[in-house]
Amino acid sequence: MIDLQFSSFYFYISSMTRSSFFHRISACLLFFLGVLLLNACADEERKLPPTSPAGEGTSSQVLVLCQGNQATRLPGGYTLIDTEHQTVNHDAFLSVNGKLLGDAPQEAIQHGAKIYIPCYGSNLVQVVDASSHRLLRSISTSTPEGVAAWGKYVFVSNNDGNVSRIDTLSLTVDRTVAVGPNPVGVSTQDNYIYVAISDGYNYKEGYKQGFKVVKLHPNTLEQVGEIRVGMNPTRIYKDDFGHLFVACQGDYATHAAEIWRIDQKDQAAVFASANLAAVDGHRIYLVRSTTDWSTGKTTVQYEVRDTRSGTTIASHFGQVQPPLDPTALAVDPHTKNIYVASRGTLDPKTRFTEPGTVSVYNDNGDFLQRYNVGTEPCVLLFLRK
């Protein structure tokens, strides 16, 4: 389970024309010119088509998924921020449906007109109408965590070692396959499904059955590849150039968190030292948050890099009115504003139970504003029209 209380949780349980002649000459010249240009650009990576249909715009609503806190019986839910009217609805799901979303929601994606939200603690994937926020279906599946969509299917990682496939027409699970211990993040790329295998509960043996991302065929769920990555891989992000970025959380002690990059040939290597990321086009926004658990002090570093070259891009990101304790970040695909979710306090007694915040910065990283949201904000989703 990707719990935003990962660090404390593990400490707790272990202590992307004039004639045909000239026509032919012109065609040949154009052909050879094209060849020369292609050779000159051999090192440039192809940009993939956008993952959303052309003309599909974002609305003014930002869904902030909040985990709550199971230990203290604080329910999960989501806050809706309307950036056009500057309103915040803290009980968006509850107010429409008259019931709670579920325990420990982990991820949220929009596919078509529906939102899919795995709720780990309730063993449910909640399917919600993206416009009205009315609950359409509760789909039973064991300890659901990551979620991604491809065509007519939605794929869900189940922490019990499986991936379930949901048919989006019938809204039922039509196939399940074993993938490895404690799968977390799920992503799609070039018509394949990629799943991070964390072995996250095997901390005593160094997560030794993890360190990998498995590649599945979406139609059969047959495993067609396995990619070695860092320790304890969790969320997976992707750019517009065929790269996947895997957040490997380490062991929260001697092995620091890293972001690994997987290229189009499924070759993986360390890309950066960070535990949180957001990708927009060719930019990856990185957050490295470390806590000294003997003092409770948290140190946060921010960086923006080019996803292709890895070079640092100059930005004010994280330098002006930074959040206290970042838990998630995302970039608005329309405005390019950067949103960073955070816990609301560093007080060890209330750190994981107090309401959180979402800070907004422009594309240069300059601070714009801050919103109050629910407890343990873990996902920022820009809803499409």
Region annotations inferred by a language model:
Residues 1-3, 265-266:
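Short intrinsically disordered, low-complexity coil segments enriched in acidic
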Residues 2, 8-12, 16-20, 30-63:
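Bacterial Sec-dependent N-terminal signal peptides
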Residues 7-8, 219:
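Sensor of tandemly repeated, compositionally biased sequence architecture
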Residues 25-29:
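Alpha-helical transmembrane segments
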Residues 42-385:
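Predominantly soluble domains enriched in secretory-pathway, periplasmic, or organellar proteins
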